[in-house]
Amino acid sequence: MLDLRIQQHFIDSADLHYQVADGLAKPVDAAVQAVLACVTGGGKVLTAGLGASAGLAQYLAGLLVGGFERERPGLSAMALSADAQMATLWPEEQGLASQVRALGHTGDVLFLISSQGSENAMVQAVQAAHERDMSVVALTGHQGGALARQLRETDVHVCVPHERVARIREVQQLVLHCLCDGIDTQLLGEQESY
């Protein structure tokens, strides 16, 4: 009964992936270069997100430390915590910013993931990163919201221009895979097709 509806989800997702591929290639490449400059220069990548985006942030940190599709030494990365225990230590909006101030240093990258970019906690995290002379990579959806407006010219904004959160997250996961593949290609060279 739901066959056609399910098929439509696949079609809609594939269509969006195809539509945004050209527009996202350059910002994803810029994100690769920012992360690569950070980790090869002795810095670390702090990843963060709220809600479901926190899961993607943890996933990215895991891929950077543990590798993507090829063996390589681990890269210095960690996911900032947005869980309930940490939330009791600071007011909700200050939690990520407090962690950035405690763990971030000049030359590090703060990699934020948000479907909308409207969360005040993310905006405060960007401000904290800038205070620490860190670069910011923001992976957002919609138009990037207040988060995008906080970015500097030297930061990187990868924005999935879509309104549906499910579709945004699907593309964001592919962006993370492209990022990790780009890093591996830069570090290890081209790999033959699979």
Which stretches of residues belong to each language-model region?
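Glycine-rich, small/polar surface segments that engage phosphate groups of diverse ligands
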Residues: 34-104
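Short glycine/serine/threonine-rich phosphate/pyrophosphate-binding segments
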Residues: 53-58, 96, 118-125, 147
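A charged, well-structured terminal subsegment
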Residues: 165-194
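Generic N-terminal amphipathic, Lys/Arg-enriched alpha-helix
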Residues: 1-23
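Short, glycine/polar-rich helix-capping loops at beta-to-alpha or helix-loop-helix junctions
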Residues: 139-154
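Short beta->alpha connector loops at strand-helix junctions that form conserved
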Residues: 81, 114, 140, 157-164
